[in-house]
UniProtKB/Swiss-Prot annotation:
One of its GO terms (cellular component) is cytosol. Belongs to the class-I aminoacyl-tRNA synthetase family. Glutamate--tRNA ligase type 2 subfamily. It is found in: Cytoplasm. It comes from Thermococcus onnurineus (strain NA1). It is an enzyme of class 6 (ligase). Its EC number is 6.1.1.17. Keywords: Aminoacyl-tRNA synthetase, ATP-binding, Cytoplasm, Ligase, Nucleotide-binding, Protein biosynthesis. It holds the Pfam family tRNA-synt_1c_C. GO terms for biological process: amide biosynthetic process; glutamyl-tRNA aminoacylation. Its main location: cytoplasm. GO terms for molecular function: ATP binding; glutamate-tRNA ligase activity. Catalyzes the attachment of glutamate to tRNA(Glu) in a two-step reaction: glutamate is first activated by ATP to form Glu-AMP and then transferred to the acceptor end of tRNA(Glu). This is Glutamate--tRNA ligase.
Length: 573
């Protein structure tokens, strides 16, 4: 490998590792660091590195990868081997084949998002790994603060199925209130729970000082009478609460005699209406259902670790075995909102146009951006069971998704902010036949026609390349010399057909269209949604939900197609 090929190798590797843009200093460091015999020639090598890096940065990622495969295929083989070395999920404690039962318990008060997906995917993957059962349990017993909505029950099921889940059982907590009542009454009869009618502020003061509520040790008969009054509507909201007896000296005041069931006046629950007034809180309903449904393993966020402490009191009172609990940290993604309350507020204020707004981190939003379900699952499995909080960058998810969609995404030219280029010196019609996918010739070709006297359109993004006297190659068409640049457009002259001439002279390559279809690409950038308008190949055979690559622009998902225009959403480079 000569010096130029060596520089080209390092420049391509650096570019592919950094979104298609190589850093000259990094390349120089690699060339001289790993080839010390070249250091005496540094003054000659540095300009050559700058020249080759400029050439590499003018390629799209596809061209960079093709070139690197040509001169250094070992890079891709090493990457493949490294990936194969990656371990999957670690063994699950106390797990037996065929006996593992896991559950995912979302609240249907908003759309399923990437943060929720961690517990869901881990639960499902382990259930499948051990030939067990995966249960979806809707935790919908808070009709006041976290009010469930009918559409979210459906959406969560749809999203899980889209992610590839096989749901073995579905249970809805609001359908099981009589079961919770039965266990609450048993605990009262056992003297392990009581009905507290202290004002909330008074109980909080007693609890914080480790002092028993005056109702705590009253006879079971009195407790049962109060319990029946709760059920019969003789107490109003806030006047009575069922509490589980715990350790009044527990270091965490929130564990001391925690609330199990409370009254909600006029709940107007979407499933049960106003039939029930006494509603279990999460820890009570969850503890009962995990036992009733035979759950063996729970995957729970580290921030909810104290739930186990509370729930174990119920398990100990009934003599039940508590499920194995695996705690993991929170998962967030840089610059993407996952909070359901913030999302809802943004939708209500008109900031977002729905739960699938591509700026959001909901599963529906990721799907709308062209993120594949396999990519989301792989990302979660890669993060694994870390107890620490994890913040991933969009680039992490994009890198996985790119590897998945690259083989399936057909290629098209999209010219953003089009500028006309008038070409002289070529007087024949020229039809460029371009593969829909460079690695899959069986998919056929797309045809772009050049007609003498009619302009081609190039992107304003490439304006810095169009200087009088410079040369560029119109990708898959021919090479031209730039003659003049003005507000009206670009004048150019045909130079040659052969790609080899452009390669030998290191001329930059640009994409183009003739008569294109109007196309807008929505690009999420943090909390902003940028719209890039331009032209798509007029004969591009795209339909809604297709994920395609706009060459030199990025991967997009087709969101809308009409005879007049195409709308796409940008996924990533």
């Amino acid at each position: 490998m000569n010096v130029e090929e060596l520089i080209m190798k390092y420049a391509l590797i650096n570019a592919i590792s950094h979104k298609g843009k190589a850093n000259p200093k990094a390349v120089i460091g690699k060339v001289l660091g790993e080839n010390p015999e070249l250091r005496p020639k540094a003054k000659e090598i540095i300009p050559l590195v700058n020249q080759i890096v400029e050439q590499v940065n003018g390629m799209d990622i596809e061209e960079q990868e093709a070139k690197l495969k040509e001169i250094y295929p070992e890079f891709f083989e090493a990457k493949k081997e490294k990936k194969e070395e990656k371990k999957g999920l670690p063994p699950l404690p106390k797990a037996e084949k065929g006996k593992v039962v896991t559950r995912f318990a979302p609240n249907p008060d908003g759309a399923f998002h990437l943060g929720n997906a961690r517990a869901a995917i881990l639960s499902h993957e382990y259930a499948r790994l051990y030939g067990g059962k995966f249960i979806l349990r809707f935790d919908d017993t808070d009709p006041k603060v976290k009010r469930p909505e009918p559409k979210f029950y459906e959406w969560i099921i749809e999203d899980l199925k889209w992610l590839g889940f096989q749901i073995d059982e579905i249970h809805i907590a609001s359908d099981r209130l009589e079961i919770y009542y039965k266990y609450a009454e048993e605990l009262i009869k056992m003297g392990k729970a009581y009905v507290c009618t202290c004002p909330p502020e008074k109980f909080r003061e007693l609890r914080d000082n480790g002092i028993a509520c005056p109702h705590r040790e009253e006879p079971v008969e009195v407790q049962l009478e109060r319990w029946r009054k709760m059920l019969n509507g003789e107490y109003k909201e806030g006047e009575a609460v069922v509490r589980i007896k715990t350790d009044l000296k527990h270091p965490n005041p929130a564990v001391r005699d925690w609330p199990a069931l409370r009254i909600i006046d006029n709940p107007s629950h979407p499933r049960t209406g106003d039939k029930y007034r006494v509603w279990p809180l999460y820890n009570f309903a969850s503890a009962i259902d995990d036992h009733e449904l035979g759950v063996t393993h729970i995957f729970r966020g580290q921030e909810h670790a104290e739930n186990e402490t509370r729930q174990r009191y119920i398990y100990d009172y009934f003599g039940w075995e508590y499920p194995v609990t695996v705690h993991h940290g929170r998962l967030s993604i840089e610059g993407v909102i996952l909070s359901k309350s913030k999302t809802r507020k943004g939708i209500d204020e008109g900031k977002y146009f729905g739960w699938d707004d591509p700026r959001l981190g909901t599963i529906r939003a990721l799907k709308r951006r062209g993120i594949r379900p396999e990519a989301i699952r792989e990302l979660i499995i890669e993060v694994g069971l870390k107890r620490s909080d994890t913040t991933i960058s969009w680039d992490n998810l994009a890198a996985i998704n790119r590897r998945i969609v690259e083989p399936i995404a057909n290629r098209y030219f999209f010219v953003a902010d089009p500028i006309p280029m008038y070409i002289e010196g070529y007087d024949e019609e020229f039809v460029a036949e371009i593969p829909l996918h460079p690695d899959h010739p069986d998919r056929g070709v797309r045809k772009l026609k050049f007609e003498p006297g009619r302009p081609v359109y190039v992107s304003k993004d490439d304006m810095e390349l169009f200087k009088p006297g410079s040369f560029v190659r119109l990708k898959d068409l021919f090479n031209v010399e730039i003659l003049e640049v003005s507000e009206e457009g670009i004048k150019a002259r045909f130079h040659s057909i052969e790609y080899e001439i452009a390669r030998e002279n290191r001329w930059r390559m640009v994409h183009w269209v003739t008569e294109g279809r109007a196309c807008g690409v929505l690009i999420p950038q943090g909390d902003e949604l940028i719209v890039r308008k331009g032209l798509l190949e007029s004969d591009a055979n795209v339909k809604v939900d297709d994920v395609v690559q706009f060459e030199r622009f990025g991967f997009v998902r087709i969101d809308d197609v009409t005879p007049e225009k195409v709308v796409a959403i940008f996924a990533h480079k």
